[in-house]
A protein has these predicted regions:
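Ser/Thr/Pro/Gly-rich low-complexity linker/stalk segments immediately outside membranes or between
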Residues: 45-64
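Cytosolic-side transmembrane helix boundary signature
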Residues: 2-34
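Internal/C-terminal transmembrane anchor helices
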Residues: 21-49, 487
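Mature N-terminal segment immediately following signal peptide/propeptide cleavage
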Residues: 60-104, 574
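Repeat-blade elements of multi-bladed beta-propeller folds
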Residues: 69-73, 110-130, 157-188, 221-247, ...
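Segments forming glycine/polar-rich beta-alpha architectures that bind adenosine-containing cofactors
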Residues: 470-504, 509-511
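Short, solvent-exposed loop/turn elements at domain surfaces
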Residues: 76-83, 105-110, 134, 316-317, ...
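Extracytoplasmic/lumenal domain signature
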Residues: 91-104, 133-154, 168-173, 189-220, ...
Length: 693
């Protein structure tokens, strides 16, 4: 996973002023400039207009299941679907804020608030960026309890916790029979009683397991947990986040499974092998510098499989020193036998990935409709590069056509490339159209000209253009077309709903001597300052790639005014019919509200991070955009039916549940902003419900 710095400076007037070093006289003349910008944006909206679909209504048969949201993605299969239908297309316009809860988290130190709450018995459970765990009454938002693990802040480069895992011991009301599990940013796995928030004393030592064991010597902040464990049976499977683009000697990316009752290690697996590791002897460590699993995993209890979206082999942007064994499983989905940790099957979405197109999305498990009218147990994997792969989750075989196509070659000296890459041609892609000089965009004719000149200077040959000293335009950037927000599936209407974004990056390779002189260092206390300084000077993030001949800078491809060099829309929301495998509608997602000059809110579609939630009521809920709204769309037509203002950026996945006490349906989302997106930071969890008379 990459943390892009300064991506969204483009809509901030003060930053534009600072970048251009405008004098007072020039600044007073900016209404003329912004008038030209506004005119250009209005013209650009011709490319971003949306007409709702006229698709026929989808007929729902049978009664709704009991609405539950007990996992990060609603179900263990990550479909982010609620069978609740009290809130529907006819009344969603009557949604209002039911309650707002503040965690009192220090927004200055929080990286991003991404924790989608889970619901158990009418109570909500979530973690703050610094791993403080909260239990709230779902009807009132009042706090039941708080557990603060007091993470070691000196060990944390940034704070993120995407959510909690839940395990219930059948037919038991004992202490910790209902328990929550969380990995922390200082490498611990903690088990809590869901009723009281107290540590489960039977788990590990004082309710926690030390995840740093077996990792060897790890630099501070280079290894931690950002996503919830995957629980299957009586084991919890835990991945890890590893700092990107640092060196060829990063911590192990080992995936480990622990007994949910005792905390005992059940098995450990990494990408160098097909079978789980034998138990380590005292003083031994897992192999370093292996691909990790930083995203959310999915499980199939019936098949006994856990599905891992894998990351890259460090460093992400240079792979010339990787071994064949290291390259076998990265940027893939790997199915492991939950009982043993052995590989059942794998499917690779990018061969020898040097673009940071790792698999960050949670695999979505569905019953996929086949051409003969039957269904197959399937796995849907959205990817950063924009393709979506549909696989038989029993075997890993594609259920829609995948072909290998030639891709650009001629990398830097010492690198090598796969001659082909897999393309999912049997399902709609969310990869951007190829860039060209004529497609360069600007808020004025001047920055459009600058973008055209810059485009001609750089190397760009479409998707999979390799890194270069000339400077490579990578589109989509490693921010992704689709990142960890993944997709939602309405199983009754057989619709896939997905939000995507577009941001090309300019990445420039430098020699070892040059990158050292520019100040690139391993991430740590000094490195954080160096990255910030580099971004402020327009270099973007500086990555050292130690152990290789090179270093690299990575920056969003923006004009001198800070606007994107490519034409809008810059963010989309799309529905795909799984039966016909066609897009039934696609629309711009988000506006420039709060970021454009003169208070203008252009519906250009904007950059977004987060996921969607779909309901039986025919609605798709999504936030994620830079304009700080939660929106509701008609899942069948794409029409926007409602929007609710959030107190901060909603860069997270929403969820919905029905209270067992009052019968009211709620839609809930964290609103804490995202440092890298420049959205308003905060500490809120906001719940919406229908107005009452």
């Amino acid at each position: 996973m990459t943390v892009p710095f300064g991506i969204l400076l483009g809509f901030f007037i003060p930053q534009i002023k600072q970048h251009l070093q405008l004098s007072l006289r020039a600044w007073l003349a900016t209404p003329v400039i912004f008038g030209a910008m506004a005119l250009t944006l209005l013209i650009a909206l011709g490319n971003a207009q949306f007409v709702p679909s006229t698709a026929a209504d989808y007929v729902l048969e049978g009664e709704a299941d009991d609405p539950k949201w007990t996992h990060y993605g609603a179900s263990a299969g990550g479909d982010s679907y609620s069978s609740a239908e009290q809130i529907n297309r006819d009344n969603v316009a009557d949604l209002e804020t039911a309650w707002t809860f503040h965690t009192e988290e220090d927004a200055a130190t929080a990286m991003t608030f991404q924790s989608t709450p889970i619901e158990i018995g009418g109570d909500l459970f979530f973690c703050s960026p610094s791993n403080r765990v909260f239990s709230l009454n779902g009807d009132t938002g009042s706090q039941n309890w708080l557990h603060d693990p007091q993470v070691n802040r000196d060990k944390v480069p940034f704070f993120v916790c995407r959510g909690l895992a839940y395990h219930q011991t059948p037919e038991s009301n004992d202490f910790c029979a209902s328990r929550l599990l969380m990995g922390t940013v200082d490498d611990r796995l903690i088990a809590l009683d869901s009723k009281t928030g107290a540590r489960c004393s039977d788990f590990g030592i004082n309710g926690e397991v030390d995840l740093s064991e077996g990792l060897g010597d790890v630099l501070t902040g280079h290894h931690f947990v950002s996503s919830p464990p995957a629980v299957i049976g009586d084991i919890a499977v835990v991945g890890s986040f590893i700092m990107d683009n640092q060196s060829t000697n990063q911590p192990p990316g080992v995936v480990r499974a622990y007994n949910v009752h005792t905390g005992a290690l059940a098995w450990a697996w990494d990408v160098l092998q097909d079978v789980a590791h034998a138990p380590l002897k005292e003083g031994e460590a897992y192999p370093p510098n292996t691909a990790n699993v930083w995203g959310v995993m999915s499980v199939d209890e019936e098949l006994g499989l856990v599905y891992l979206p894998t990351g890259n082999v460090p460093p992400d942007f240079f792979g010339g020193l990787r071994t064949e064994e290291q390259d076998r499983y990265p940027s893939s989905v790997v199915a492991l036998e939950a009982a043993t940790g052995n590989v059942s099957w794998s499917f690779q979405t990018v061969h020898h990935d040097i673009w940071d197109y790792d698999a960050g999305s949670q695999p979505v498990l569905v019953d996929f409709p086949l051409d003969d009218g039957s269904t197959a147990p399937a796995l849907i994997l959205p990817t950063k590069r924009g393709d979506i792969f549909i696989l038989d989750r029993r075997t890993g075989e594609p259920l829609t056509e995948v072909v290998e196509k030639p891709v650009p070659q001629n990398p830097v000296e010492g690198e090598w490339l796969s001659p082909t890459q897999p393309f999912s041609v049997g399902f709609p892609s969310f990869a951007p159209e190829d860039l060209s000089e004529s497609k360069m965009w600007g808020s004025t004719m001047f920055d459009q000209l600058w973008c055209r000149i810059e485009f001609k200077k750089r190397r760009y040959e479409g998707l999979f253009t390799p890194q270069s000293f000339q400077g490579t335009i990578q589109d989509p950037g490693n921010f992704g077309a689709v990142d960890w927000g993944s997709a939602s599936v309405d199983p009754e209407r057989q619709l896939l709903l997905i939000n995507s974004t577009g941001m090309p990056f300019l990445q420039i390779m430098y020699s070892r001597e040059e990158i050292d002189q520019m100040g690139a260092r391993l991430w740590g206390t000094e490195a954080k300052d160096e990255v910030a300084k580099g971004a402020a000077k327009g270099k973007g993030a500086l990555w050292p790639l130690l152990g290789t001949p090179y270093g690299i800078s990575s920056n969003a491809f923006l004009s001198p005014l800070g606007f994107p060099c490519h034409q809008p829309p810059w963010g989309r929301l799309t529905a795909v019919d799984l039966k016909t495998r066609e897009k039934i509608w696609e629309r711009p997602l988000g506006t420039t509200d709060g970021h454009a000059p003169l208070g203008l809110a252009f519906p250009t579609g904007v950059f977004n991070i987060g996921g969607t939630a779909v309901t039986r009521g025919g609605l798709t809920f999504v936030a994620g955009t830079i304009d700080n709204y939660l929106r509701a769309f008609n899942s069948e037509t794409g029409a926007e039916l409602w929007r609710g203002a959030l107190p901060a950026g909603g860069q997270a996945g929403p969820m919905s549940f029905v209270s067992p006490t009052t019968g009211s349906q709620y839609v809930v989302i964290p609103a804490g902003g995202h440092v890298s997106m420049g959205t308003v930071l905060g500490d809120a969890v906001v719940a919406f419900k229908l107005k009452t008379d």
